[in-house]
Amino acid sequence: MPSHRNSNLKFCTVCASNNNRSMESHKVLQEAGYNVSSYGTGSAVRLPGLSIDKPNVYSFGTPYNDIYNDLLSQSADRYKSNGLLQMLDRNRRLKKAPEKWQESTKVFDFVFTCEERCFDAVCEDLMNRGGKLNKIVHVINVDIKDDDENAKIGSKAILELADMLNDKIEQCEKDDIPFEDCIMDILTEWQSSHSQLPSLYAPSYY
């Protein structure tokens, strides 16, 4: 654990529906004392339904509490046994509703995506915004399988990476070295301990 977690650093976690992987990482980073937001890049929020061919689909912005109550009315037993109700209960304690990345106006220092298509969507969206602020953002993908167990494993690994980045920024400021010159070393060191979580990196701009 770092001696000082800088709450001025702005972190963001992103998955497809802003319900499982991004929200578990949101929770873990927030509990560690970091400034964190979370988003989804999908066209809608999709959660498993009562049959494989009929997922539950909601618009971004639909409160987690409303989704929870909808699933509760469909089948409390089914959605409790597959963990969806517990997941939504966690989510509604963190924020009101799933948010869509493409509608976000916040500016972040680091964006952690949880699968490659989300990484691509974030990078493409930032490129389309045109980089008018000339503010660098480090987009890092950590490939996490979309289930409860892997979301928990992935979130701990993301916290570890956030701590390493946090410490390196502090060290670079003391030594008057550009952080951008050091980030690949951090990612390489982190990846060597997490071979089961393939990562990607792209610097982008707001």
UniProtKB/Swiss-Prot annotation:
Its EC number is 3.1.3.16. It catalyses: O-phospho-L-seryl-[protein] + H2O = L-seryl-[protein] + phosphate; O-phospho-L-threonyl-[protein] + H2O = L-threonyl-[protein] + phosphate. InterPro entries: RNA_pol_II_suA. It is found in: Nucleus. GO terms for molecular function: phosphoprotein phosphatase activity; protein serine/threonine phosphatase activity; protein tyrosine phosphatase activity; RNA polymerase II CTD heptapeptide repeat phosphatase activity. GO terms for biological process: mRNA 3'-end processing; sno(s)RNA transcription; termination of RNA polymerase II transcription; termination of RNA polymerase II transcription, exosome-dependent; termination of RNA polymerase II transcription, poly(A)-coupled; transcription antitermination; transcription elongation by RNA polymerase II; transcription initiation at RNA polymerase II promoter. Its main location: nucleus. Keywords: Hydrolase, mRNA processing, Nucleus, Protein phosphatase. The keyword Cytoplasm does not apply. Transmembrane segments: none annotated. Component of the cleavage and polyadenylation factor (CPF) complex, which is composed of PTI1, SYC1, SSU72, GLC7, MPE1, REF2, PFS2, PTA1, YSH1/BRR5, SWD2, CFT2/YDH1, YTH1, CFT1/YHH1, FIP1 and PAP1. Component of the APT complex, which is a subcomplex of CPF, and is composed of PTI1, SYC1, SSU72, GLC7, REF2, PTA1 and SWD2. This is RNA polymerase II subunit A C-terminal domain phosphatase SSU72. The gene is SSU72.
